[in-house]
């Protein structure tokens, strides 16, 4: 970079026709369009019009002449105002005038005789010369703008040098004030230039340089003041020199970006996706070969070499200190699986070459039908590399979860030692702080290595570079404070560097979060919290206060990070049911679970730290710890609610079948048993496969009914329509009850099933009340009777679910044997038939019949059958009851809408003023404001271009060259 006294050098060739700003492009585009249109006149051959009388050509020629005149007027004005490029601009204006006159003459001659190839060729050459002249004029005008910016930079450089040469604090304050004024002017001019730059990389460089200038300007004053106040402390000079260097580099960055010069090698090092991700992408592309041209001698060594380089990178990650033992074993296992899959694939290629099993048509596409052994081997190879990617991502997330936890603690400890004036401790803690910073940079680079997000990787690497350069200066500020602990200036300097460090760490953290998957983060965080919970319990039992306190702090930090990241993630979505459920889960963890956990930790530490052992309820602590784990897991379940099966396939911690059926009305979940024990749900999960298959058949029928309800409620906006809201609630509860029969879902015990049945009955009663109000207002007797009949069905099937749930409650696990209490079942069975008889008697014969009686009244429930058959009968009854109720709800929703339309049809607008429920069509399904992109899509995504084709002048000129033959 030039010094303060060096002349301004424009790194720009005036003869170059490269367009670097959007303004020049937009100004040139109309002229290019007009000239191109004129040149292409009658390009399709002779027309039916009279020769030599093309009115359109004359109009186009006149428009070109007018556009040229406008450029001349603006060019002359710019030339008068410019000081540095005055001669060049005047020369360019004269050239445009000369070429414009030539173009006017040749275009007029061509317009008179558009079929003449000679006149057309002459006009093409004139058009090319005119476009070149206008382009050069605009580029020179653009260079004049850059010169004005460089002049501002020169003034700022001189002001910076003046600040550096200040001799006392008063002089510094005066000079810094002048520097600040020039900074404001420079920022305004640079911002305008940034918006005009055509190259997005140059815009990014300009934005980064402006940000660095603003950031370091705040540190410039305190660092200079500390140096003037304490010149005998070497650390103050290091601080000041660092800040001055950063400001100078920022000024140079603005100058380079403004002129759109090539980036330096350092900046080029920041570009591109991660090395390991790129290697895996390349390997995945290389394994798909043409079997007819496959050569083992040619392809085997290169593929094996590429794979071994990938495995070497994976091994380095596996051997890192923060990688868990189980994760290391999984990475090693996946590496071995990938090796074996490659050998199997190469063998299949050899077999295809040897036996020639590929058909000609298949060879053209490069693939055979799905069942072909080679395709199977390719798919297996791809799956294994995908599995390896997943384990590497989880390993990286292990590092991130551990390293980006309580990132401010080493800094706070360092500052506290500096405030006490203990230079020895400061040096010791400085080493800890330096190791912490190095770890952040190392982990950030690891995250980059496996990421396909090119822009995100660039941001992370730049932020990591800033962290690396800022770390020594934070230590210098601490050393200054330690040497002069009573100095207000040293304290202010420390505060400024502290704030800057914290901001930079936040930038790095957010950048790392952007290139990692929130699903991976939640999965790893959940596992880490479970590890820490177990460590806490062990420390509590062993009376290890330090470990308990430290591990509990880690749990609080992990939970806080989960809450922060998920809240930020939800800002990418429009508000709706999905975001509401996720935010409710985070709110519960933040406001209820974590305060209770912190309270229990405090009680435990006080009890263990007391000289005389204090009584402490260990189970309360374990329950509070378990709730933290459950809270994080609930957040994860809520986040995964909208994931597709393909996205969930990469999450090995969740079984695919738990998410096969997802809709707007239900959320399916699973549960881990942290505490060993046989709940009713666990018993259901242990049924023989034959019994599970029968239950699955019933569940499939239930899902068909559920799909009908989904389709019906999806039509309507539930705001102002409690019937739709209740239908969704009932569907969700019924899904949980059917999940229970498969050993899944949130319902764990028979008491949970009974409570769920009660909730359904309550919702059914509320729906009955609303729908009867609709029926009362319906003037059509047939519609009214239909609706009432469907409501009677709901009452019947709600009662049926109550009975089936109570039957399950009578199944007791006594000494490992299940016993069915026949008396209780008989009483509920009798009560049910009394209700069913009343319902059928009160309904329309066309709507209800004895065939609808619930299956839970079958005699199998009274027998003393085996344990498995009893459980099967009970589960089947529960599912069928839910299916029948689901069907009744669907019919009720439809009938309620029909009845409402009849009412409005008869009473007109008066009905709209006081409707029981509001029937409005639902708006299109909400989508994320920011599209979630899979990591593998970053390289293959295609951005849609502008609808309007932009023809660059250079391209237009090259096209004209091809026309010279005319």
From Swiss-Prot:
UniProt keyword list: Cell adhesion, Cell junction, Cell membrane, Cell projection, Cytoplasm, Cytoskeleton, Developmental protein, Differentiation, Membrane, Nucleus
GO biological process: axonogenesis; brain morphogenesis; cell-cell adhesion; dendrite morphogenesis; regulation of synapse structural plasticity
Record GO terms (molecular function): actin filament binding; cadherin binding; structural molecule activity
Biased composition (Basic and acidic residues): 924-940
Skewed-composition ranges (Basic residues): 941-951
Disordered as annotated region, ranges: 924-952
Superkingdom of this protein's organism: Eukaryota
UniProt keyword annotation of Disulfide bond present: no
Entry membrane topology: Peripheral membrane protein
GO cellular component, one term: adherens junction
InterPro entries: Alpha-catenin/vinculin-like_sf, Alpha_catenin, Vinculin/catenin, Vinculin_CS
Subcellular location(s) per record: Cell membrane; Cytoplasm; Cytoplasm, Cytoskeleton; Cell junction, Adherens junction
Function, as annotated: May function as a linker between cadherin adhesion receptors and the cytoskeleton to regulate cell-cell adhesion and differentiation in the nervous system.
Family note: Belongs to the vinculin/alpha-catenin family.
Name this protein carries in UniProt: Catenin alpha-2
Organism annotation: Xenopus tropicalis
């Amino acid at each position: 970079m030039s010094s303060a006294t060096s002349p301004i050098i424009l790194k720009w060739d005036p003869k170059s026709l490269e367009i670097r700003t959007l303004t020049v492009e937009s100004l040139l585009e109309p002229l290019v369009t007009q000239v191109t249109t004129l040149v292409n006149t009658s390009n399709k051959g002779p027309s039916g019009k009279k020769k030599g009388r093309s009115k359109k050509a004359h109009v186009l020629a006149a428009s070109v002449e007018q556009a040229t005149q406008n450029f001349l007027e603006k060019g002359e004005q710019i030339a008068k105002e410019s000081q540095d490029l005055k001669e060049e601009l005047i020369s360019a204006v004269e050239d445009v005038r000369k070429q414009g006159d030539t173009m006017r003459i040749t275009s007029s001659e061509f317009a008179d005789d558009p079929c003449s190839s000679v006149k057309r060729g002459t006009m093409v050459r004139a058009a090319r010369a005119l476009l070149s002249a206008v382009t050069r004029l605009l580029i020179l005008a653009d260079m004049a703008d850059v010169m004005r910016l460089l002049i501002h930079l020169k003034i700022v450089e001189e002001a910076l040098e003046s600040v550096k040469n200040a001799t006392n604090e008063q002089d510094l304050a005066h000079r810094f004030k002048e520097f600040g004024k020039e900074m404001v002017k420079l920022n305004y001019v640079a911002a305008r230039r940034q918006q005009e730059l055509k190259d997005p990389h140059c815009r990014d460089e300009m934005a980064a340089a402006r940000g660095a200038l603003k950031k370091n300007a705040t540190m410039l004053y305190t660092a200079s003041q500390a140096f003037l106040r304490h010149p005998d402390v070497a650390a103050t000079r290091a601080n000041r020199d660092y800040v001055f260097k950063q400001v100078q580099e920022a000024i140079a960055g603005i100058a380079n970006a403004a002129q759109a010069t090539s980036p330096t090698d350092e900046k080029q090092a920041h570009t591109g996706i991660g090395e390991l991700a790129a290697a895996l992408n390349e390997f995945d592309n290389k394994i798909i070969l043409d079997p007819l041209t496959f050569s083992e001698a040619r392809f085997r060594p290169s593929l094996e070499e590429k794979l071994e380089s990938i495995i070497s990178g994976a091994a380095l990650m596996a051997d890192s200190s923060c990688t868990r033992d189980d994760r290391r074993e999984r990475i090693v296992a996946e590496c071995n699986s990938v090796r074996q899959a490659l050998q199997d694939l190469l063998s299949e290629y050899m077999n295809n070459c040897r036996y020639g099993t590929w058909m000609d048509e298949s060879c053209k596409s490069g693939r055979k039908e799905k069942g072909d052994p080679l395709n199977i081997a390719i798919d297996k190879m791809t799956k294994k590399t995908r599995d390896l990617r997943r384990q590497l991502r989880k390993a990286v997330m292990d590092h991130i979860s551990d390293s980006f936890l309580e990132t401010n603690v080493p800094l706070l400890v360092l500052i506290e030692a500096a405030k006490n004036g203990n230079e020895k401790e400061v040096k010791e803690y400085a080493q800890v702080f330096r190791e912490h910073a190095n770890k952040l940079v190392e982990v950030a680079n690891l995250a980059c290595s496996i990421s396909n997000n090119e822009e995100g990787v660039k941001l992370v690497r730049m932020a990591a570079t800033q962290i690396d350069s800022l770390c020594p200066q934070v230590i210098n500020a601490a050393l200054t404070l330690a040497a002069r602990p009573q100095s207000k200036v040293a304290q202010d300097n420390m505060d400024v560097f502290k704030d800057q460090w914290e901001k930079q760490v936040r930038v790095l953290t957010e950048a790392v979060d952007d290139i990692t998957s929130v699903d991976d983060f939640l999965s790893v965080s959940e596992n880490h919290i479970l590890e820490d919970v177990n460590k806490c319990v062990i420390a509590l039992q062993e009376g290890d206060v330090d470990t308990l306190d430290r591990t509990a702090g880690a749990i609080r930090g992990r939970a806080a990070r989960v809450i922060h990241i998920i809240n930020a993630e939800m800002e990418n979505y429009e508000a709706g049911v999905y975001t509401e459920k996720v935010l409710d889960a985070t709110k519960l963890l933040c406001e209820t679970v974590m305060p209770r956990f912190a309270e229990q930790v405090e009680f435990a530490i006080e009890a263990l730290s007391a000289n005389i052992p204090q009584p402490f309820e260990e189970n309360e602590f374990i329950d509070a710890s378990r709730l933290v784990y459950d809270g994080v897991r609930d957040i994860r379940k809520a986040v995964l609610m909208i994931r597709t099966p393909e996205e969930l396939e990469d999450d090995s911690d969740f079984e695919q079948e738990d998410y096969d059926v997802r809709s707007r009305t239900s959320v399916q979940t699973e549960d881990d048993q942290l505490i060993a024990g046989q709940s009713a749900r666990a018993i259901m999960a242990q049924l023989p496969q034959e019994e599970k298959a029968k239950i699955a058949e019933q569940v499939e029928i239930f899902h068909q009914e559920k799909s009908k309800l989904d389709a019906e409620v999806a039509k309507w906006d539930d705001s102002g329509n409690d019937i739709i809201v209740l239908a969704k609630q009932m569907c969700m509860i019924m899904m949980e009850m059917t999940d229970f029969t498969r050993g899944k879902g949130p319902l764990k015990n028979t008491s949970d099933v009974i409570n769920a049945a009660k909730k359904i009955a309550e919702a059914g009663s509320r729906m009955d009340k609303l729908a009867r109000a609709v029926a009362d207002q319906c003037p059509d007797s047939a519609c009214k009777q239909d609706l009432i009949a469907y409501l009677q069905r709901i009452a019947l099937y709600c009662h049926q679910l109550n009975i089936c749930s109570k039957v399950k409650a009578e199944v007791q696990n006594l000494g490992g044997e299940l016993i069915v209490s026949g008396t209780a079942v008989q009483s509920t069975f009798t009560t049910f038939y009394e209700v069913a008889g009343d319902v059928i008697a009160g309904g329309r014969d066309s709507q209800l019949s004895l065939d609808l009686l619930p299956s839970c009244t079958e005699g199998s429930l009274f027998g003393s059958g085996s344990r498995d058959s009893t459980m099967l009968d009970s589960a089947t009854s529960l599912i069928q009851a839910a299916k029948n109720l689901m069907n009744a709800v669907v019919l009720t929703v439809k009938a309620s809408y029909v009845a409402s339309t009849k009412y409005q049809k008869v009473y007109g607008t008066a009905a709209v003023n006081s409707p029981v429920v509001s029937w409005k069509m639902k708006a299109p399904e909400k989508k994320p404001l920011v599209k979630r992109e899979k990591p593998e899509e970053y390289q293959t995504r295609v951005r849609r271009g502008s609808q309007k084709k932009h023809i660059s002048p250079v391209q237009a000129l090259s096209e004209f060259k091809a026309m010279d033959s005319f």
